[in-house]
Amino acid sequence: MGAGEERPEALGFNPQKEIVYNLLLPYAHRLDRESNELLAQIKGSLGRAVRLRELWPGVLFWTRKLTTYIRLYGRKFSKEDHVLFVKLLYELVTIPKLEISMMQGFARLLISLLKKKELLSREDLQLPWRPLYEMLERILYSKTEHLGLNWFPNSVEGVLKTLVKACRPYFPDDATAEMLQEWLPLMCPFDVTMQKAISYLELFLPTSLPPDLHCKGFRLWFDEFLTLWVSVQNLPQWEGHLVNLFARLANDNIGYIDWDPYVPKIFTRILRSLNLPVGSNQVLVPRQLANAYDIGHAVIWITALMGGPSKTVQKHLTGLFNSITSFYHPSNNGRWLTKLMKLLQRLPCCIIRRLHRERYKKPSWLTPVPESHRLTDQDVTDFVESIMQPVLLAMFSKTGSLEAAQALQNLALMRPELVIPPVLEKTYPALETLTEPHQLTATLSCVIGVARSLVSGGRWFPEGPTHMLPLLMRALPGVDPNDFSKCMITFQFIATFSTLVPLVDCSSLLQERNDLSEVERELCSATAEFEDFVLQFMDRCFALIESSALEQTREETETEKMTHLESLVELGLSSTFSTILTQCSKEIFKVALEKVFNFAVSNIFETRVSGRMVADLCRAAVKCCPVESLKLFLPHCCNVISHLTINDDVMNDEELDKELLWKLQLLSEITRVDGEKLLPYKEQLVQILHRTLHFTCKQGYTLSCNLLHHLLRSSTLIYPTEYCSVPGGFDKPLSDYFPIKDWGKPGDLWNLNIKWHVPSAEEMDFAYYLLDTFLRPELQKLDLYSSGELEMSRDEVQQCLAIVHNCLTGSGNLLPPLHGERVTHLVTSMVSLNETKLFTGIDHDHSRENYRELISKTLRKLLHYILDHSEDDTKSLFLIIKIISDLLQFQGSHKHEFDSRWKSFTLVKKSMENRLHGKKRHIRALLIDRVMLQHELRTLTVEGCEYKKVHQDMLRDLLRLSTSSYGQVRNKAQQAFFTALGTYNFCCRDLIPLVLEFLRPERQDVTQQQFKGALYCLLGNHGGVCLANLHDWECIVQTWPAMISSGLSKAMSLEKPSIVRLFDDLAEKIHRQYETIGLDFSVPEKCIEIAILLQHAASTSSQLPHPEELALAIKRQGEKNVEAVQNYERLVNTLLDCVTQRNLPWKFEHIGIGFLSLLLRDDYVLPVRAIRYLVQCLNHDALIVRKMAISTVAGILKQLKRTHVKETICPYKISGCPKPESKLVGDRPDNQWLLYDSSNLPNTKEAWESCCFVEKTHWGYSSWPQNMLVYAPADQQPKVGRSREEMSEAEQIIYDHFTDEKFVDQLIKFLSLEDRKGKDKFNPRRFCLFKGLFRNYDDAFLPIIKPHLERLVADSHESTQRCAAEIVAGLIRGSKHWTFEKVENLWNFLCELLRTALSNITVETYSDWGTCIATSCESRDPRKLHWLFELLLESPVSGEGGSFVDACRLYVLQGGLAQQEWRVPELLHRLLMCLEPKLTQVYKNVRERIGSVLTYIFMIDVSLPNTAPTKSPHISDFTGRILGKLKPLMDADEEIQNHVMEENGVGEQDERTQAIKLMKTILKWIMASAGRSFCTGVTEQMQLLPLLFKIAPVENDTNYDELKRDAKTCLSLMSQGLLLPVQVPLVLDVLRQTARSSSWHARYTVLTYIQTMVFYNLFIFIHNEESVQGVRWLILQLMEDEQLEVREMAATTLSGLLQCNFLTMDAAMQAHFEALCKTRLPKKRKRESGMVGDTIPSGDLVKRHAGVLGLSACILSSPYDVPTWMPQLLMDLSVHLNDPQPIEMTVKKTLSNFRRTHHDNWQEHKQQFTDDQLIVLTDLLVSPCYYA
């Protein structure tokens, strides 16, 4: 650090990490005192606020101040303070009952405190993990959110996860072991808890522990998780999380883990997860696409594995790119493309990050990468070489060249000599082409990315800089008025290169110096062209300007403003020109200045488009060298203007002379320069202002106002005056300065030598003189006018206001902010809430007139006058609104301009940064820009300002304007109003009552416009404050009821669509943004302990609280909580009063009920009156109200739920087994007691009560939790069967309604109506309602509901059946805690009911009954539901009621059993026994269902690590039995035809027919399980392969019967399966055996199978040389097959495998094919003399054809380039053009394909051929035979 040494003395502490740019500000010397005062204030006040337990406003106010402090100064505090801040915020964030919006605020601050983890080591800080886990559990897995008892914002998940990531490095050493204990018991792979466990582990597990703690860290879980990952398949959702965890682990511990054994698997998985389409006829597995790996993490993982002694990773990476390169070709497009592009962009970026960390980063406490595993130069070279080809292809991708450009930028930092030449090779031709402009934009954007590497040359690529001038000269034609995008990229290109290079002509040095290198001499002579380049560029710009003049581009009547495109071109033009002139030598500048001056003076431009552009160019010139340029321009303009205004009549002209306007415009732009240089001309300028400021012509006086505005800004602002790429510029003699050394040189942060413009006393005087001369008279005029003492026309008033506005915005930072007294009584606080004053470079001179005060006084008077006398003068009102908002906000820069400058700064920084070396090595201009932005940031830091009386007056004026009669005035005023609301502390509380005044129904005098305006003020703008929904009881208590009551206002009219829409928007916004507001604001003691430390760390001890204050604080905290509850109840009651008013329009009643539903909470029961009202709403006439009521009453029932007692058990005691020694998952002796056992069911009261029920299905599968909780026995639970007297008032209300038959009748009637035909589904809200009723009141309502249920079930209508299903599910779930007698009675009734229901099931309702049963069984002990399971298993497939009922019963049964997962093996066995005889079912729908049920039966049979063999059915036994039955098909030779019709024939059928029927069902099973199960039972299913090959057809034909179609799908799905290395030989055996089959269909299908299988398991195969050879042998053998189709497919397969580099075209293979080609054919005569019918090809012809096919496969395997061996192969092929068919056809096809694929880049490809070869080739490609 250049300034690192002296900081501790200056500050009194060693700062953690400050923002260095602050040290470069012109007033840097004053900042240390300022920041120290602010820091002391923050520490003192924040500590005090916490000790006084005042979360709001105190703590919130001061944490915001800390956030601002970090934004302004960085982490400019000592390490001790840093730790205290972190600890305090950690305690605050984890307060259990903290309001959610506060929690998010604290969390964001804590994240930014922990963001730079190198600043605090594990020694400095430890944070516990459990409070964070409890918070995530409470919020992300909230039990009450879905019932509407908690409202969390959408952002909360992201914030919490980021918070955990930030705290993770500081978890204690034992955290890993504790986390595993907590979450491993959840790891049951069939359950959703698996996803939860893995995502928690991914989020929390610390991976950056130091090496000596690895045994306490990842070593505890690494092997177990990795083997788990290796053995799963089909991407279950949690697999992605594991990958993210491994990626992070690998990245944090490079060199400490040996990943080599897993590399082939890792790459195979990554390749699979790209979901690329492969193979000749493929059906992609319907995997959930969202489950693919996150490319970002996959890339981090790959990067972390690179380097080190073994080079396997680079080898695999090269393999990966070889296999996917062709997908990058621009002609390919698909949804997979975005992933591929992201891969390209991220990889180089990650490698750069890693290189930076290993070679350049400052060492910190984080473990460094060991020397042995760092990336060597050779590693880097290999990497760059492997990725170059895809990147070059991606340059022209359909999705644009952005990713390629970013990749090239990073690659060029590593190896410019490998990267830049190929890019240039593509760029030069693109610059010449006229027909393909997209090539130009793509290549230029890529060259911009590599510009810095190109220009700086360096040891790797010294010849780089020589390309710069040729590129610049060739790019000039891109400045083309007819092609906008080309124009913009060219400007960017030229600007980028000019910024990097001083444009100085050094050619004279060639004579003087002889110590120059070859490249330097070449560059010196080239620089002679700079001048030429600049002049040519200017000519191009002038042409562009002339063609875009207003007269040329549109009619006079059209818009006067520039179009969006024009303004972009204007910006590009002026910034590029300004960059070029900044970088010019004096000599070149003079020539350019002369040229631009002549152009500007010799023409007259219109002032709207071309005039603006020319004035911009002139301004750019003047800015670079103010003295010389002003001498040229200023007197000229002044003279012309004076001359043209000699005659006083000009003042009153409506239209001014074109030349006068143009010169005025030019003058107003060239005065935007260093204010000091304007002083010599001040008299002339003032004279011009006198002459022009009061033109009658608006265009004239506007330009004159601009001049005044710019003069004021130039004199009073602080800004840098030059942006040259080298400090001090290039104006030095060449003898002492050699510019070429500075090509591409970065700025040096510690020697920037910024030249600042700081206003001098003389300039200040000039500014005040201007204000006194021009502003004061206007204000006096307006003052007289608004007193009625002076007549003025509207135009004159507008002119006055325009001058006032320009004076105000010109001198914004000169005028001190408005003063006055504070508005008190808005909030009470025991902590000071003072605003912070920042020094921004100017000491305000209070002895002079403060014009800001004066303007505000005059304007308010004027505003009231206009509103009272001429409200329709909207143009004046617009100006007044602008002035008010600038009076309030403006201190020299506007927020939106600053934001867009910050954005463009970031863009430029990104496009030219060097991430490899880091350390802010940006170009000097960019660094200066950043310092300037830092200064502007300080001027804009205004939030948290005190709310003073002056502000109050102006805000009230804005509110009056926001409710005025004119829509446009309202709109503009509202925007200003919203901005101001966000600026002043607590002002909303002052304004809400004033806004609501307009909505009061009693008022008779409110107009519709005022009503609308007030509603808009409540609604707020996008992203700003929304008054209607402040997170504060006191505000909501006022706003919500007022909105409802406004429905009775006279101004309200439901006929007006705009008003209806406003209410809709308001309601929608409140629902979207509402977050639960806190009722408990207590501060725990833990926070207070840290606050005391923090206060003592503050240097000022004056604020330490007094003991009396502390006592008062505790009292205040209690009062605040009571007050919150009172406000809450008041709000609910007021809303009820509003909603029940007579005559209230229905719309408002609905909105009101919506508001009530937001007020449900989980920590406070809704007031009784509201409960009564909402229960009555269940039978409201309006459907929308009934829907809301159903949800709300379900929530109320949850609030009224009584808690059930739990107790801890020891599972080992219950099972009587000891704890297992080693880790074992699945069916173990100690969890057998959990399983369903029909011989030991709890079907008596004693058995029921002694049975230990475990409801959650995942417990016990993986391991038992530390503390296993189950429900305590019934006698300890809340009483069941209470009488009405024993209930609370709230419970009685619900009880009374649901025991009232009429009420229930009506409710059921409503519930069984249909809502949207055919769209309705089982409704979980209604289910929750019934579940709540039966849970809270056990069977009290059963007698009333029973008859309804019986009626509903008997009716087969869709809506009635659905209603029954919802109630039944609610009953079964609600009966969880009933006593045995009640449950038994319930089931006696339900069994009958369900039997009826299942026999009445229909197409529309079967999925609802499925949902009903699945919902009833989820997370329930199966032994509790034994009645249900026995019922469902009575006769799953009986044939009664037809095939449809069977299919439905199976569906319902599957729903129930699937929820039970591993706990019902007995039932699964019983079901399988039932189904096996039925597998030959004839009906398709039953077969499909059986297939699906089988998948679930075998789901539990998984081969995961440490898993015991399951008690549930095993796939292998089942497949064995099936294969026996399929034997008749296996043995048969001929192709299998499906001749079984869909009805059952009479009598016994032969074995073969039975086997075909069986096969059909088995196919359905394989299809269903392909996408679902974790592990395909590969070894077993492999044995079915030969049969599938036999059945599957070759062509795609929709007429094929089901059997063939399914067989084809199964093959496709199986070929995509993930193979374990042991399985590869098995599969190859099956394929070999099939390749000998007599059916050519089977042989053909083997090939398509190989294509997909190899690609989807690429690295597993490549890893094993034997299997590669096996595949190769198979293909070569099939290439000589007697069937033509098989040969051709073998060739296609070969070509594909060559293309993805699985096989290589080695000499042996080439020789093999060439030999086959030379096979002699029988003489033609002999052939003809044979029989006419003799079409079987002779063996010789087959062999020769095989050879030709082999050669053609090689040619087609390189579709996008010409390798060295290709020309010769093409020649070999051409010999066979006249061979007999099918050889001739093959040759033709190959040649036409070659021509098609190589046509695009033929110029480049031509180079590979000799002249002779080219002649032959040209003949071939256009020979007559080509068209024959």
From Swiss-Prot:
The keyword DNA repair applies. Gene3D superfamilies: Leucine-rich Repeat Variant. One of its GO terms (cellular component) is cytosol. HEAT repeats lie at residues 462-506, 985-1024, 1164-1202, 1339-1377, 1621-1659, 1665-1703. Its main location: cytoplasm. InterPro entries: ARM-like, ARM-type_fold, Blm10_mid, HEAT_PSME4, PSME4, PSME4_C. Residues 1635-1723 are annotated as: Bromodomain-like (BRDL). It comes from the Eukaryota. It is found in: Cytoplasm, Cytosol; Nucleus; Nucleus speckle. It holds the Pfam family PSME4_C. The bromodomain-like (BRDL) region specifically recognizes and binds acetylated histones. This is Proteasome activator complex subunit 4. It comes from Xenopus laevis (African clawed frog). The lineage of its organism: Eukaryota, Metazoa, Chordata, Craniata, Vertebrata.
